[in-house]
Amino acid sequence: MRADMSSAQDWDESFDFVIVGSGGASMCAALAAKALGKRALIIEKLAKVGGSTGYSGGVWWIPDNPVMKRAGVEDSYERARQYLDSVATYHGPGSSDARRETYLRTGPKMVEFLERYGMAFQYADGWSDYYDEKPGGQPRGRSLVAPLFDINELGEWKNRLSMYPGVHLPMGSQDFPTLFLAKRTWAGKLMALRLAGRMLRAKLTGKDLRE
């Protein structure tokens, strides 16, 4: 009976895909649907969009990605798989061989797809794999971050984003390790000076730079 009532219902809108949640994966899914000529609807229970992605550090670990290759860093599926298997020894349902292969094979394709539709990435050079001494580890890293962006350009959407509360510094995640050594290294001191200059310019120009 419920099925009969549902089929007779007149709807105001019709969509090919209904996506629950508004995090990074949901946004990618909606973009993929749009690229296929389909209509997608993202539904979010909270007042702000972004989900837990908005509270994350914003670092993507994508081995063998095109951005690192453009930076002159070579990688391969085989090397990345060797590293992943050496550090992630648990092989339960959430970390099966099939999931590992899918993640490593399709990750670079996802980056290419997002770049094609306007997403900007920056190679976090020096953000090494956590266990880069393990087989297949990459000392220069396989991580991607977003370049700094003035979120004032988003207009009213600026206040609709879920973001980690507190002070937001105009710097990328890959710069924090260097900044933390400001009292011990010249590179850290230089990073601190750059940050101060960037904060001053942002203040004078009214920009709100975020990663």
Q: Where do the protein language model's features map onto the residues?
A:
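Extreme N-terminal leader/targeting segments of oxidoreductases
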Residues: 1-17, 35
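Generic signal for short, ordered secondary-structure residues
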Residues: 12, 32, 92-93
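N-terminal Rossmann-like FAD-binding beta1-loop-alpha1 element of flavoenzymes
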Residues: 17-42
